[in-house]
Amino acid sequence: IPNPTPFVGVTGGRNSVPSVLDLNQDGKMDLLVGNFLGHIREYHQILNGDTPHFKLERRQFLNLDVGLGAVPRVADINNDSLPDLIIGSDRGRIVNFQPQQEKAVNAMNWKLKDGYFDKLDLPVGGSPVFEDMDFDGDLDMVIGTEKGTLVYFRNTGR
């Protein structure tokens, strides 16, 4: 049975796509919510008794605008044991941010990793997911497309 109670007031705009991670390293899961306009909203979890609630921190996380249809994903794509933030868009663009752990005290300090996905021929649709599909120890990427097909990109470590 769906229970929207902890998410009352949490909106991302049209075509909301949530991703969950501990952004401020306080031990509670926070939300990044992508939307149709290409922006991502940042919500931090606050506890009210034993019920989680979320507070809007930023309407445009990292001042990011990926065009249309921001799809945030969290995955350790470079095997450094830190969560990377990968954002797909409806225009076939993927942006990658990696945390700068040495600068982060109580929060993730994200830095754009330019060119990480540039050599790939990405489809329009940009809804990536990451999983070790070939069981070789690194994360591969599957992207859902505007046409309804799925495209597989094997991570070869290059």
Give the label of every model feature segment:
Residues I1-G13, H44-G67, Q98-P123, T156-R158:
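Blade-edge motifs of beta-propeller repeat domains
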